[in-house]
Protein backbone atom coordinates (compact mmCIF):
# COMPACT_ATOMS: atom_id res chain seq x y z
CA UNK A 1 0.00 0.00 0.00
CA UNK A 2 2.30 2.81 1.29
CA UNK A 3 5.84 1.56 1.97
CA UNK A 4 7.16 4.90 3.30
CA UNK A 5 4.97 6.90 5.68
CA UNK A 6 5.66 10.27 7.31
CA UNK A 7 3.60 10.75 10.47
CA UNK A 8 3.32 14.40 11.50
CA UNK A 9 2.73 14.49 15.26
CA UNK A 10 1.84 17.54 17.33
CA UNK A 11 3.31 16.96 20.79
CA UNK A 12 0.93 19.54 22.23
CA UNK A 13 -2.16 17.68 20.95
CA UNK A 14 -2.23 14.47 23.00
CA UNK A 15 -5.78 13.39 21.97
CA UNK A 16 -4.94 13.97 18.30
CA UNK A 17 -1.64 12.11 18.65
CA UNK A 18 -3.37 9.13 20.26
CA UNK A 19 -5.96 9.08 17.48
CA UNK A 20 -3.21 9.24 14.87
CA UNK A 21 -1.37 6.32 16.53
CA UNK A 22 -4.56 4.22 16.57
CA UNK A 23 -5.16 4.86 12.86
CA UNK A 24 -1.53 4.03 12.06
CA UNK A 25 -1.84 0.70 13.88
CA UNK A 26 -4.94 -0.05 11.79
CA UNK A 27 -3.05 0.75 8.58
CA UNK A 28 -0.08 -1.35 9.73
CA UNK A 29 -2.42 -4.33 10.05
CA UNK A 30 -3.00 -4.10 6.27
CA UNK A 31 0.68 -4.43 5.39
CA UNK A 32 4.26 -3.49 6.17
CA UNK A 33 5.13 0.18 6.26
CA UNK A 34 8.24 2.07 7.24
CA UNK A 35 7.37 4.97 9.52
CA UNK A 36 9.12 8.31 9.88
CA UNK A 37 7.86 10.26 12.90
CA UNK A 38 8.15 14.05 12.82
CA UNK A 39 7.36 16.85 15.24
CA UNK A 40 8.22 20.33 13.99
CA UNK A 41 9.54 22.49 16.81
CA UNK A 42 8.63 26.16 17.03
CA UNK A 43 11.71 28.25 16.29
CA UNK A 44 12.78 30.74 18.93
CA UNK A 45 13.65 34.34 18.05
CA UNK A 46 17.38 34.98 17.66
CA UNK A 47 17.33 37.29 20.66
CA UNK A 48 16.20 34.36 22.85
CA UNK A 49 18.78 31.99 21.38
CA UNK A 50 21.58 34.37 22.33
CA UNK A 51 20.65 33.93 26.01
CA UNK A 52 20.42 30.13 25.94
CA UNK A 53 23.28 27.67 26.57
CA UNK A 54 25.43 26.79 23.54
CA UNK A 55 23.99 23.32 22.98
CA UNK A 56 20.37 24.21 23.68
CA UNK A 57 19.21 23.62 20.08
CA UNK A 58 20.84 20.17 19.86
CA UNK A 59 19.53 19.21 23.31
CA UNK A 60 16.00 20.33 22.40
CA UNK A 61 16.07 18.34 19.15
CA UNK A 62 17.41 15.28 20.98
CA UNK A 63 14.71 15.57 23.67
CA UNK A 64 11.94 15.75 21.04
CA UNK A 65 13.37 12.79 19.10
CA UNK A 66 13.43 10.82 22.37
CA UNK A 67 9.80 11.76 22.97
CA UNK A 68 8.93 10.52 19.46
CA UNK A 69 10.67 7.17 20.12
CA UNK A 70 8.80 6.86 23.44
CA UNK A 71 5.56 7.74 21.66
CA UNK A 72 6.18 4.95 19.14
CA UNK A 73 6.91 2.47 21.91
CA UNK A 74 3.83 3.46 23.96
CA UNK A 75 1.61 3.00 20.91
CA UNK A 76 3.21 -0.22 19.59
CA UNK A 77 4.59 1.44 16.48
CA UNK A 78 8.29 1.14 17.34
CA UNK A 79 8.99 -1.98 15.27
CA UNK A 80 8.05 -0.08 12.12
CA UNK A 81 9.84 3.21 12.87
CA UNK A 82 12.73 3.92 10.51
CA UNK A 83 13.67 7.29 12.00
CA UNK A 84 12.51 10.29 14.03
CA UNK A 85 12.81 13.91 12.95
CA UNK A 86 12.53 17.15 14.95
CA UNK A 87 13.24 20.10 12.68
CA UNK A 88 12.64 23.66 13.83
CA UNK A 89 10.64 25.92 11.54
CA UNK A 90 7.43 26.00 9.56
CA UNK A 91 5.18 23.01 10.25
CA UNK A 92 3.79 22.69 6.73
CA UNK A 93 7.06 23.59 5.02
CA UNK A 94 9.19 21.18 7.04
CA UNK A 95 6.71 18.29 6.80
CA UNK A 96 6.57 18.68 3.01
CA UNK A 97 10.37 19.08 2.75
CA UNK A 98 10.92 15.90 4.78
CA UNK A 99 8.35 13.96 2.74
CA UNK A 100 10.17 14.99 -0.44
CA UNK A 101 13.66 14.24 0.92
CA UNK A 102 12.58 10.84 2.26
CA UNK A 103 10.57 10.04 -0.87
CA UNK A 104 7.55 9.46 1.33
CA UNK A 105 4.52 7.83 -0.22
CA UNK A 106 2.03 9.40 2.19
CA UNK A 107 1.80 11.89 5.04
CA UNK A 108 -0.52 11.12 7.98
CA UNK A 109 -1.60 14.09 10.10
CA UNK A 110 -4.47 15.10 12.32
CA UNK A 111 -6.74 18.06 11.64
CA UNK A 112 -7.95 20.34 14.37
CA UNK A 113 -11.52 21.50 14.24
CA UNK A 114 -11.93 24.63 12.18
CA UNK A 115 -12.29 27.89 14.09
CA UNK A 116 -12.49 31.48 12.87
CA UNK A 117 -8.73 32.13 13.03
CA UNK A 118 -7.90 29.01 11.00
CA UNK A 119 -10.69 29.85 8.57
CA UNK A 120 -9.16 33.28 7.93
CA UNK A 121 -5.46 32.41 8.07
CA UNK A 122 -5.45 28.82 6.87
CA UNK A 123 -4.07 25.79 8.66
CA UNK A 124 -0.99 23.63 8.51
CA UNK A 125 -2.94 20.59 7.33
CA UNK A 126 -4.52 22.64 4.54
CA UNK A 127 -1.07 23.78 3.37
CA UNK A 128 0.30 20.22 3.59
CA UNK A 129 -2.62 18.76 1.62
CA UNK A 130 -2.38 21.53 -0.97
CA UNK A 131 1.39 21.48 -1.53
CA UNK A 132 2.57 17.91 -0.86
CA UNK A 133 3.64 15.83 -3.85
CA UNK A 134 2.50 12.62 -2.16
CA UNK A 135 -0.84 11.47 -0.76
CA UNK A 136 -2.02 13.03 2.49
CA UNK A 137 -4.26 11.20 4.96
CA UNK A 138 -6.06 13.59 7.29
CA UNK A 139 -7.15 11.81 10.47
CA UNK A 140 -10.26 13.07 12.25
CA UNK A 141 -12.36 11.83 15.12
Task: Give residue ranges: language-model regions.
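Glycine-rich, Arg-bearing micro-motifs that act as flexible, cationic patches
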Residues: 109-131
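Structural beta-alpha unit
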Residues: 1, 73-107, 114, 126
Amino acid sequence: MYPSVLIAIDREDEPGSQLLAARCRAFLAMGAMGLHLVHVRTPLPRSYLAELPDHWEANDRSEVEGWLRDFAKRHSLDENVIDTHAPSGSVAGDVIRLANELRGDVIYATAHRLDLVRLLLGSNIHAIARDARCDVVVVRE
